[in-house]
Amino acid sequence: MKAYTSLKSILAEFFPLHRTLASDDHDKTLEIVGSYMPDSSNYTIETYAPLTPVWTWKVPERYVVHEAYLETEEGERIVDFQDNPLHIVSYSLPVDKTLSFEELQPHLYFNEKRPHAVPWIFKYYERDWGFCLPRNTFDRLPRDKKYHALIKSEFVTDPQQGFKVATALIHPAGGPNPGAGEFLVQAHTCHPMQANDDGAGVVSAIELARRLAESPLPAGSMSVRFWFGPETIGTIAWLAHNESLIPNLRGGIFMEMTGNQNRIAWHRTRQHNHLLDRITAYQLQSVDHEERAFASAPANDERVVNGPGVNVPCISLNRFPYDEYHTTDDNLDIIHEDMLLGAAEVAEQIVRVYASNYIPKRTFRGPVFLSGHGLWVDWRENWALNRAIEKIMMRFEGEHTVFDIAEQVGLDYWTVREYVEKFRIKGFVTSHPIPSEGQTS
């Protein structure tokens, strides 16, 4: 694992790359991300053959751009892919034509609200070609001239040059507990020259991984799986190739747009009032935040993970909306280190509670002889816990998680968990994992 001085410095390494769905620069991005992941995380890049059916979708081809520009018939260059990869519509078809302005205009894209900026436009599945430019440049184009549009692109279907995603796994103290399952943290990597959407979420996830590796979750907790790849189709392809993992996933967080100066927003799970929702709301009590419905804008891979036929409860964290979205103004200038770290902190607190939570089930009969087993809590040292002891023990029937119990008795989760652990160590309760809700059909 490479050391880093700031999350923004990591982002600066892959921000300028043309990291579209499947491309050489996307491969480089995954390699850069891997270099900063903890050495113990077994960071692995998976490759899927283009055009392979994955559920109702197909794995996309690798996209290669050799050259692309738009110029006047006199040779005056208007936009050039070499200057900025956003100048062409992502996954544009090859073209080499001389056109009138009227013929060219349907293939030109700009942002009305930000006339100085180049928009990011993609047509992954609606195959066409196009150029992106500032509205100010568009307005200056002579209407009576001819234009030369050149895009030398190809769609590679060689299985050896396939579509890639990456995963890493960080275990709790003492190693994995297979029965506890895994918690999934995702960030997508496929938006070229976009710093906040999506590079910021990637580096916040890297920071979360570092924290969980340096200060592991308690023994017996879930492992935390990190996933990096192209939005939507990346998760679909990964899950379609790894369906056996789905029942093992107990919850998830999708992270994006974490670097701008908005308050944090979280989107509920599809279940709406799931344990994961309650834990998130609990952890954000003292944080200025906004709460949103599942899959409200900006909806991303939680629609796959928590969608039909998968159903793993998943929230998302972001700082959307922001005016620079999907333009060249979404650059390093709008990224703030404290925002990146703040999002990692929020995610960490949610993960630490959810992944360490379990269901305690009693083995004892009758009230436990507390003082005889070192389980008495002196009221002079902790009045609140002393008054809650009976309530806690009455909830050891295997119907409540530790978080449920803490919520019901009105105490901090970690206070209650530490106390319940004493019962487990004495053999008075056994720990049972959070049940799987993942579907495989």
Outline where the language-model segments fall.
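N-terminal hydrophobic/helix-forming segments and targeting peptides
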Residues: M1-V312, S316-S441
